[in-house]
């Protein structure tokens, strides 16, 4: 199974399944001398981990990361950093009914067709549980970006279903507000509506989609390798690799369809840009403006409402998903999206430095 590694100079490889013994990753390319311990990584994992609020899956995992290699006396050595997170709260018996059935909307059918075998327990490798290791690797990238380049990578939830934050809130994000509520939302009025919507969905046994935005500030000019490794192309690749993501926007994204060139172009003065419709990337290269990326996540198919499907023998069956699941996967996806953006940015920064010494 290929496709488990991302990056060229800053490279992350993950392994593990939802109900396996542990999850793990290997991070290559971290420069030597970075102060690093589990305490630097754990806060981001705590933001992603399940069971932290009534709005997410009740599965409880401590998600305590353990660094196995690549750090000596509190400093990175420049060698591979190995990390693991042990799984503790698996309930594999919840998935016995789908051993021979395909859950509609999930990767069950495609994994079975591609590999001829699948770990049906919690989705196995296709589960979003795997993203814990992306967050761990991303925490290292965020720390290096912040300490060595002053780059800040932060995200917020912009919409759940038809409830969206106010446009004026987006213009001036209050990051303290984002970190003060379980929705990672900068709009207090939207938080209340999110709460009502999620409560109703849990009663109905249904789920809902979401939209979230990641902003990277203080990114230097010049990152990106046209034409095939454009910065926006690599960001889109990384973000589309997150479970349940169905669309990626850079800057104004799909809204550009209704814009005119006279309005969309980011005009410049000696003092700088007058707008940022391009989301901080021009011609596939960072412009020095904040990089803005938005993703849309589908409603999870893990719901208790019966659905039609087929089994291994291609016979019609009814599927009712058991187990513990998020009514909106977009909530816990905020730190995951931050991690993927940070991984791409650090990789491109290292590539840019290597090319322009």
Curated annotation (Swiss-Prot):
Its EC number is 4.2.3.5. Keywords: Amino-acid biosynthesis, Aromatic amino acid biosynthesis, FAD, Flavoprotein, FMN, Lyase, NADP. It comes from the Bacteria. Transmembrane segments: none annotated. Pathway: Metabolic intermediate biosynthesis; chorismate biosynthesis; chorismate from D-erythrose 4-phosphate and phosphoenolpyruvate: step 7/7. The keyword Flavoprotein applies. CDD domains: Chorismate_synthase. This is Chorismate synthase. The gene is aroC.
């Amino acid at each position: 199974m290929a496709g488990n590694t991302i990056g060229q100079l800053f490279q992350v490889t993950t392994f593990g399944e939802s109900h396996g013994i542990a999850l793990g990753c290997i991070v290559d390319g971290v420069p030597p001398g970075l102060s690093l311990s589990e305490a630097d990584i754990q806060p981001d994992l705590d933001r992603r981990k399940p069971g932290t609020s009534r709005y997410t899956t009740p599965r409880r995992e401590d998600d305590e990361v353990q660094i196995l290699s690549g750090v000596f006396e509190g400093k990175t050595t420049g060698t591979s950093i190995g990390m693991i997170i042990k799984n503790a709260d698996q309930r594999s018996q919840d998935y016995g009914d789908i051993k021979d059935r395909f859950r509609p909307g999930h990767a069950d059918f495609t994994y079975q067709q591609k590999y001829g075998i699948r770990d049906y327990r919690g989705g196995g490798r296709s589960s979003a549980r795997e993203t814990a290791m992306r967050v761990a690797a991303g925490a290292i990238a965020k720390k290096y970006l912040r300490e060595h380049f002053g780059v800040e990578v932060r995200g917020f939830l912009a919409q759940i279903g038809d409830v969206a934050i106010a446009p004026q809130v987006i213009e001036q994000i209050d990051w303290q507000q984002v970190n003060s509520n379980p929705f990672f939302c900068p709009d207090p009025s939207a938080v209340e509506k999110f709460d009502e919507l999620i409560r109703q969905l849990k009663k109905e046994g249904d789920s809902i989609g979401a939209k979230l935005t990641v902003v990277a500030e203080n990114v230097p000019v010049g990152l990106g390798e046209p034409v095939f490794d454009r910065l926006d192309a690599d960001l889109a690749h990384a973000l589309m690799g997150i479970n349940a993501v169905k669309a990626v926007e850079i800057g104004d994204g799909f809204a550009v369809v209704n814009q005119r060139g006279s309005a969309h172009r980011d005009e410049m003065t000696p003092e700088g840009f007058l707008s940022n419709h391009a989301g901080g990337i021009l011609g596939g290269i960072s412009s020095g403006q904040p990089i803005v990326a938005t993703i849309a996540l589908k409603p999870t198919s893990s719901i208790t409402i019966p659905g039609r499907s087929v089994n291994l023998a291609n016979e019609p069956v009814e599927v009712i998903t058991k187990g513990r699941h998020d009514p909106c996967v977009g909530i816990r996806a905020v730190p995951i999206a931050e991690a993927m953006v940070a991984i791409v940015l650090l990789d491109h920064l290292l590539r840019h430095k290597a090319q322009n010494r």
